[in-house]
């Protein structure tokens, strides 16, 4: 059981945070699309509350993951992996974090500028309504979601390509 990343494998905490993020995002993304088509009413309020709670949870997990990445550098990629692929992998990871943070922060700001009260880190926060800004943050929220979906597809495709065509054990590092 690794408590810190090794040269070849991620630590158990890193793996747990990764897979927890994956599970929540794979619930959260379809939930968000479902929410868009719901009429206003009790069901929408319930689903929206779940969506906000999961969104804030992802936000906290990503912050913890970023701190973990700073304190606990990632394992090195095998030198046999082409330098360009290593660069693309790094960029994909960075952009995944940027997209997730963009989604969560824009979602938070959209709710706040709509005049809603959010509880963040055990504090209730409310700001003055600004529906124009709320609409802009909603657009960022949507664009960031589509960006995230594209990045996830690239991420999974790269894992499959590495497993099937390159025969390396890249996936083992995070399992």
PLM segments and residue spans:
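Membrane-embedded alpha-helical bundles that constitute the cytochrome b-like, heme-associated redox core
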Residues: 1-175
């Amino acid at each position: 059981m690794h408590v810190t990343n090794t040269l070849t494998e991620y630590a158990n905490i890193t793996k747990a945070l990764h897979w927890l993020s994956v599970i929540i995002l794979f619930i959260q993304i379809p939930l968000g699309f479902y929410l868009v088509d719901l009429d206003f009413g009790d069901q929408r309020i319930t689903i929206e509350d779940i969506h906000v709670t999961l969104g804030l949870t992802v936000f906290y997990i990503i912050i913890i993951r970023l701190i973990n990445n700073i304190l606990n550098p990632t394992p090195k990629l095998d030198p046999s992996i082409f330098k360009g692929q290593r660069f693309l992998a790094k960029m994909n990871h960075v952009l995944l974090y940027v997209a997730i943070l963009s989604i969560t922060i824009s979602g938070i700001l959209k709710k706040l500028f709509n005049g809603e009260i959010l509880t963040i880190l055990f504090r209730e926060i409310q700001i003055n309504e600004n529906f124009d800004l709320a609409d802009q943050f909603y657009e960022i929220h949507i664009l960031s979601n589509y960006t995230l979906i594209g990045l996830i597809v690239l991420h999974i495709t790269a894992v499959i390509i590495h497993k099937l065509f390159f025969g390396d054990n890249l996936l083992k590092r995070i399992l």
